[in-house]
Structure formats: structure tokens, C-alpha cells
Amino acid sequence: MSAGLNLAQLQAVHYTDGPCLVLAGAGSGKTRVITHKIAHMIDAGLPAKRIAAITFTNKAAAEMRERAKGLIGRAAKDVLICTFHALGVRMMREDGKVLGLKAQFSILDADDVTSILKDAGGSSDAATARQWQWTISKWKNMGLNAEQAMAQVADDNERITATVMARYEERLAAYQSVDFDDLIGMPLKL
């Protein structure tokens, strides 16, 4: 089962006393370690539905799913293997009502975000909307809402952006929509 793993990789696979952080460069075998760890946990009696493996990209999730299937067969369908954003969507579909969202909320693409920001800011300039989006994204990734962002603005441009953010958030709530940053930030509030 653990063929092809070096000593450090085997230690990570067999470590069971809590979380295990695997740090390694590209092509070094992280996916192999994680999929073997999944197989080891299932062999040790942990139900597959209690295991989650979260990645950054859809490509990595698909690769991990295929490798897990190769090691554990049909049990792989019960392991949650997805991206951080997909996990956020799943959590928000299940419990988003706590945040005022219906289960069938919409996820905005980049063009939708730009359009709503232009409307919220009263501007027809896409470059201005992209600048607002960049700053709002930064604030959201810091865990700030519009009111909190306004409390820490450094200049008039940020003050305008915080005002646009407040209007943008109002529109998202009215449209029952979220952007990609919300898929990471909102589940943290659940």
C-alpha cells in the first residue's frame, strides 16, 4: 500500500495524533502522501465520509480524487475531496440561512462583479471598478465588511471604495449572490 514512499512521507501517512502539515515543493509527492494517508485512515477504520482533503485548484482535486480511487476503490466517492471554494459553497448551501442566504444563492463571475461595482459606484469605467474590486477583495480577505473597512480608511480613494463596498454588499444581499471572496470568508462566520 505504501510502496514508493520515502521515510518522511511514510511518517506523514502513519501520523495519527492530530493534524499533520505536509510542506513540500511541486512534484515532490504531496498528493501521493495525502492519498496514501486517506487509504491508511480508512484501513484503520475511519469512515470515508469523515475524511476531507481540500486543495487549491480543481485540477489538483480531480487528480487527488483519481489517485484516491486507485488506492481505495469505491470508498473514494465518500471522501470529500474538493477546493477551498467548493467547500465554502457546500457549507453555505447547507447553512447559509444563518448568513441570510437562500440555499440557491448565485455565485458571481468576474463580469458580474465588475458590472455590479460599476453600478454601486456610479461609474462606467471598468478600470475604476477593477481597482475597487482589488481593494474590496483585499478587505474581504482580511475579514472586514464595509463598515469595518470604512473605520480604517487611509485616504479619500479608500473612503470612496468603502462606500462602494457598502453599496456592493447591499446589492449582493438583494440579489442573493456572493463573489469568490465570499466563498472563503463567509463560511468562517458559520
Sequence positions of predicted segments:
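A basic/glycine-biased coupling hinge at the interface between accessory DNA-binding modules
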Residues: 17-20, 39-188
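N-terminal pre-P-loop "Q-motif" helix
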Residues: 2-17, 180-183
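Low-complexity, intrinsically disordered short peptide segments enriched in small/polar/basic residues
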Residues: 10, 30-31, 35, 76, ...
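Walker A/P-loop
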Residues: 17-36
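Short Gly/charged-rich anion-binding patches and loops
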Residues: 8, 36, 112
